C-alpha cells in the first residue's frame, strides 16, 4: 500500500505573536483523498500549536505522544520535544513512523523529526512538508519586506505554496497565539 504524504505546514513568529497553519490536502499516491483535513491543532489548553506532515496515522500517533509529553513536563515545550525525539529515535515501533511535527508556543518554535532532531529556526519561521520550502521562502520575504501580521504571512505563504506544490491545496487551517 502506498504511503499518505505531502502537505505544507508553516509557522511564523513576529514579536509575541505566532501563527501556525497548514493546507488540507491528503493524497494517496497520485490521488487526492481529502481536501479539507485539519493538520494543525491547539493542544495543552490552547497554549501550544502543533502541525504535522507525513503519514496520517503516523502523525496522529506522534501527536498523541507529544501531548502526553507536554502533560508530563507541565507544558515545557523544549523538554517535551526533546523527550519525544528521544523516544522516537530509540523505540522500535516509533522509529518506523514517517512524519514530522512543527510545534510552537509563546516563546519557541521547533521542528521535530524522526531522526531525533529538535531544530529551532533562527528567524522564527519554520516549515515542514512537501511545500514547506516554498512557504518558508515566501514567509521570509514577506516578514522582511512588509508589516503583515504572522497570520497574514502564513495565509499568503500557504497560498503561494499551494500554487506551486502539487501536494498542497488552497484550503487552510491557521491557528494563532498572541
Swiss-Prot record:
It catalyses: ATP-dependent cleavage of peptide bonds with broad specificity. Na(+) binds at residues 162, 165, 168. The keyword Hydrolase applies. It is found in: Cytoplasm. GO terms for molecular function: metal ion binding; threonine-type endopeptidase activity. Signal peptide: none annotated. Protease subunit of a proteasome-like degradation complex believed to be a general protein degrading machinery. This is ATP-dependent protease subunit HslV. It comes from Herminiimonas arsenicoxydans. The gene is hslV.
